[in-house]
Amino acid sequence: AALVTPLTERGAQDPAWLTPDAREANPIRVSAKDYRAWFATLPQDFAEAIVKHWGPPPGELFVDRSRDPDGEIVIAAMQSGNTVLLVQPPRGFGENPVAIYHDPDLPPSHHYLAAYRWISAAQQDGGFGAHAVVHLGKHGNLEWLPGKTAALSAECGPDAVLGDLPLVGRP
């Protein structure tokens, strides 16, 4: 409960929990301007797939326009000093979330990409400035992003999302 309640109060990366009050109060935000700058660094084919499926950046999913009409992507997370804790963003929504979770052709949403880019980007560039990501639990869903499953290239989803950020997963 010590972690579930505060994460839920911040929206828990779930539209059902991200009430207008939670969205407006959330301090962790990625401006549309910063997100577009990050998005512009993606491999062209990967970026085009995201736009085709989710629309132009910053999208509408988890976007708050109460402070900035251009939009800010809200990241439901808890930050304490040099540690940040968040629920992994969803890959998508629909009637069959398990199929969406494991869909190797579904590109990540703008919100999904923004969360990882915020984690990895330097603080002076609007990010958290992490040195690594640690996934806890059964497994994450990065490995299900479009692209190869071994010998990843910059055009593969997991590499495009994480960039140079090391990922420590459950062994």
Model regions: which residues?
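Extended, H/D-rich, highly charged conserved domains that either
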Residues: A1-L85
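Catalytic or ion-translocation cores adjacent to nucleophile or general acid/base/metal-coordination motifs
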Residues: A1-D21, V84-Q88, E95-Q123, G127-V133, ...
